[in-house]
């Protein structure tokens, strides 16, 4: 399931609680004891469940470390919950082909629809893009030397004679 963004204020607490209850009833949040494969005397693979005490110790360590297991949600369960569909959230079984567009994050009208849009003389901002060379604004006191476009120090001529000499 991929979600691009979420408007958390749009869901009521009761609807979230009922959704969580549905997930629990579907058996998604049940703690399943992991299986371990072992070989018996004949070399055949057998599945062995870990001891309950060991899994309780691991679960207690996970809680103290703040670890939350990754939960897999069946897409059919989400289709049944139509009231949770939102134009701001995209639920899909497939991973997105490209990241979300950044220009939507820069537009003030998209972020806050109640605010008025300011006029911008520069156009759209290009965050993360820099020019090839940075400009410097300072007074030139020495007019006899300069730096050319290749970065070499050159001497500036005071006079340029043109024509036959």
Curated annotation (Swiss-Prot):
Q: What is its main location?
A: secreted
User: Where can this protein be found?
Assistant: Secreted
Instruction: Please tell me whether the keyword Ion transport is annotated for this protein.
Output: no
Which N-terminal residues, if any, form the signal peptide?
1-3
List UniProt keywords, sorted A-Z: Cleavage on pair of basic residues, Glycoprotein, Growth factor, Secreted, Signal
Residue ranges of the propeptide: 4-119
- Annotated InterPro entries: Cystine-knot_cytokine, Nerve_growth_factor-like, Nerve_growth_factor-rel, NTF3_N
Q: Where do the record's glycosylation annotations fall on this chain? A: 112
* Pfam families given in the database record: NGF, NTF3_N
- Does the entry annotate any disulfide bonds, and if so which pairs? none
Gene Ontology molecular function, alphabetical? growth factor activity; nerve growth factor receptor binding
Repeat as a keyword of this entry, yes or no, is no
Q: Which GO terms describe its biological process?
A: cell surface receptor protein tyrosine kinase signaling pathway; modulation of chemical synaptic transmission; negative regulation of neuron apoptotic process; nerve development; nerve growth factor signaling pathway; neuron projection morphogenesis
Any one GO cellular component localisation term in the record = synaptic vesicle
Summarizing the function annotation, the protein's role is: Seems to promote the survival of visceral and proprioceptive sensory neurons.
Instruction: Describe the family membership recorded for this protein in Swiss-Prot or TrEMBL.
Output: Belongs to the NGF-beta family.
Kindly provide the name given to this protein in its UniProt entry: Neurotrophin-3
Organism listed in the record: Acrochordus javanicus (Javan wart snake)
